Amino acid sequence: MSTFTLTILGARGSMAVSGQERAQFGGATSCYMVQAGEQTVFLDGGSGLIDAPSEFASTPAILLSHLHLDHILGLGMYARLSKKGLRTDLYVPAEEGEDASSALDRVYSPPYWPLRLGEYAGDVRIFPFSSSMRIGNVLVETMPGAHPGGCLAIKLTFEGKSLVYATDQEPDGETLGRLADLAKDADLLMFDGQFTDAEAEMKKGFGHSAPSEAIALMERCGAKRLLLIHHDPLRTDAQILAAEQAIGLENVRFARAGETIRI
């Protein structure tokens, strides 16, 4: 069976942070590298993308769940995009009536950034999402989630195994049901766990969830493992470890920077 792995390049939410007190779980923002055989797929392009390799066996694809800054921070400094002749496919959730390139140009263009991504030396090709599509041998399925401005939940299936990436989510009843359908029997569910229960109650409408809500979804959909992501920027390693220990489930973990997980 071919390799199907997830490497955590960045799991921090909202903004990048630094310091020894946050080193174990990492300070880089959302970016995950999935290796499915010879196909590489990145989930989001946050600041963690800066540490990604730039040479691959086939054309890599970067899937952006949404265009909030913490999820696209790394694109402008990703070395591969500046290497002439290297192709990178970038999938962007554009608003209705807007093409995918224009959506990114709102940030990656003067005066906010010196170049548009399409002006880099590399061969950067920008595409819109489809609700179901194939990238190499990987089946990609998406659905709109619940987050201010929108955010896609993304399912990757490869050789009979699947992972579901559902960052930045605060689902109501209807959206929760559709997420449960998307993640049914997934081998790995990656879900927003930024808030504590108390914070989730105080910050309704912010578009994030607590671990208890993620666990409830895991149990509802029958996912085998849960990886909690999008850590609050102020949360320290000690606080995250304490939360993980309080949960006390072997199949539930908070994402750790640099970790590689076999799907």
Question: Where are these predicted regions, by residue range?
Answer:
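Cap/insert and terminal regions of metallo-dependent hydrolase folds
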Residues: 171-258
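Glycine- and other small-residue-rich loops at beta-strand/loop junctions that grip anionic moieties
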Residues: 93, 143, 168, 203, ...
